UniProtKB/Swiss-Prot annotation:
One of its GO terms (biological process) is negative regulation of DNA-templated transcription. SUPFAM superfamilies: Chorismate lyase-like (SSF64288), Winged helix' DNA-binding domain (SSF46785). Induction: Up-regulated by konjac glucomannan and by cellobiose and mannobiose, the possible degradation products of glucomannan. Repressed by glucose via the carbon catabolite repression system. Residues 29-48 bind DNA. Keywords: Cytoplasm, DNA-binding, Repressor, Transcription, Transcription regulation. One of its GO terms (molecular function) is DNA-binding transcription factor activity. This is HTH-type transcriptional regulator GmuR. It comes from Bacillus subtilis (strain 168). Transcriptional repressor of the gmuBACDREFG operon which is involved in the uptake and degradation of glucomannan. The gene is gmuR. It is found in: Cytoplasm.
């Protein structure tokens, strides 16, 4: 984990544990950089992450403030540029993964097109139920090219795929393209997510790509409506 990520995690915990008063600016970058024994640039990058997450906002000439509505609740909050994966997004929660299906297959025309591969290139097909603090949160269906993301196995699937990609394979995840839509729950959602027949589902269609610009993941995540929030923060300068 990079220094700025360690600092961002600590600052995130401080914000959510009310270490800093919400009606006053947090300590300035110079003071925080000195406290964390880091450069000001590293400190700025850490705070930039928290601004992007919707926890902080900067007011020119006045400092950096906590956004009061960003206090922790029981939902998964995803901001527009979030590419961490659920395990990293909810570090302070107990997360389990139940692997429902895992196999290598040849992609359909649609899957191949989203991954920029041909239909003769094998992909992992993974269906996982993500359980947070004992409650089912999201049902994930994921496709990844086997040649691009080698080494996926049961151990990885029960831990974090993104940690495997970044820490083991040393690949850099550069970005993501998402489409978010409301859907009716189907019998599979009802079976695994514990939702009712009339409950809506928030589906996220996702294409992730590496810093080379190559897509490495095409997935669909089916979220319980009561456990998922998309956060967009716009600050008037």
């Amino acid at each position: 984990m990079n220094k700025y990520e360690i600092i961002a995690n600590e600052m995130r915990n401080r914000i959510k544990n009310n270490v800093y008063p919400i009606d006053q600016p947090i300590p300035d970058e110079v003071s925080l950089a000195k406290e964390f024994n880091s450069s000001r640039m590293t400190m700025k990058r850490a705070l930039d992450n928290l601004v992007a997450e919707g926890l902080l906002f900067r007011k020119r000439g006045h400092g950096t403030f906590i956004i009061q509505s960003a206090i922790q609740d029981d939902h998964v909050h995803v901001v527009s540029n979030e590419i961490l994966g659920l395990t990293n997004l909810l570090k302070d929660k107990k997360i389990k993964s139940k692997v429902i299906q895992f196999e290598v297959q040849f992609p359909t025309e649609e899957v191949a097109a989203h991954l920029s591969i041909d239909q003769k290139t094998p992909v992992y097909y993974v269906v996982r139920l993500r359980i947070v603090e004992g409650e089912p949160y999201v049902l994930e269906k994921t496709y990844m090219p086997t040649h691009l993301i080698p080494g996926i196995n049961d151990d990885v699937l029960h831990d974090s795929i993104y940690n495997h990609i970044t820490n083991v394979l040393q690949l850099k995840i550069a970005g993501t393209h998402r489409k978010i839509r409301a859907c009716k729950s189907d019998h599979i959602d009802q079976q695994h997510l514990g939702c009712k027949q009339d409950d809506p589902i928030l589906e996220v269609e996702h294409v992730g790509f590496l810093d080379t610009g190559i897509p490495f993941e095409y997935s669909f995540s089916r979220h319980r409506h009561d456990k998922f929030v998309v956060t967009s923060v716009n600050i008037r300068r």
